[in-house]
Amino acid sequence: MRAPLLPPAPVVLSLLILGSGHYAAGLDLNDTYSGKREPFSGDHSADGFEVTSRSEMSSGSEISPVSEMPSSSEPSSGADYDYSEEYDNEPQIPGYIVDDSVRVEQVVKPPQNKTESENTSDKPKRKKKGGKNGKNRRNRKKKNPCNAEFQNFCIHGECKYIEHLEAVTCKCQQEYFGERCGEKSMKTHSMIDSSLSKIALAAIAAFMSAVILTAVAVITVQLRRQYVRKYEGEAEERKKLRQENGNVHAIA
């Protein structure tokens, strides 16, 4: 068999030079195109998907979903990394998270300054009076409620507080009685006054009856006299008539 004929050396060299030139030109074009479209290669959408460059889309490749956002231990960008460092530097305060964007923390009282602590220490501390068992408190005189709560309790009297009974009473004025001295007593007549009044009433009744009887007697007497006078006048007229009649008969 005959060996295949090899191309001449100048042709091979020219092909190699042309291929290297095309390769170098293709690399320069890819670098410039990738520099212009750099935001698309590294952008992430709001839902956590990575968007490929236009060169990849033009070549027919589809948008490939990327897995969930990287964990806090591996930040995806410089901004996220800065926030994570800030959260790490903050003091850990116990709290609870209501939402992804809201964090509720407990209120912590700020520490006192040295000046405030010195001012508080300069103030004299009040000494507690009385022993531990409170004997002196028991021996203290209790406040009189008549001076505060029951100041206007008694209407017509004076308020009195009885300590051993722990009760409030009223010392009423004359002619007043009751719990609050609000009732007034009326004066009652003695037996002598009542008997005198009875005697006076009897005398008045007797006098009135006597007056009435005398008036009746006087009236009856006057009526009788009038009747008698009238009767006597009629009798005299009858006598005169009889006398006249007798004289007439005698003449006839």
From Swiss-Prot:
This is Amphiregulin. InterPro entries: EGF-like_dom (IPR000742). Residues 38-92, 108-143 are annotated as: Disordered. Residues 20-100, 188-252 form a propeptide. Residues 142-182 form the EGF-like domain. Residues 1-19 form the signal peptide. Glycans are attached at N30, N113, N119. Keywords: Cytokine, Disulfide bond, EGF-like domain, Glycoprotein, Growth factor, Membrane, Signal, Transmembrane, Transmembrane helix. The immature precursor interacts with CNIH. Residues 54-77 have a biased composition (Low complexity). It is a single-pass membrane protein. One of its GO terms (cellular component) is ER to Golgi transport vesicle membrane. Disulfide bonds join C146-C159, C154-C170, C172-C181. Ligand of the EGF receptor/EGFR. Autocrine growth factor as well as a mitogen for a broad range of target cells including astrocytes, Schwann cells and fibroblasts. Belongs to the amphiregulin family. Induction: By phorbol 12-myristate 13-acetate (PMA).
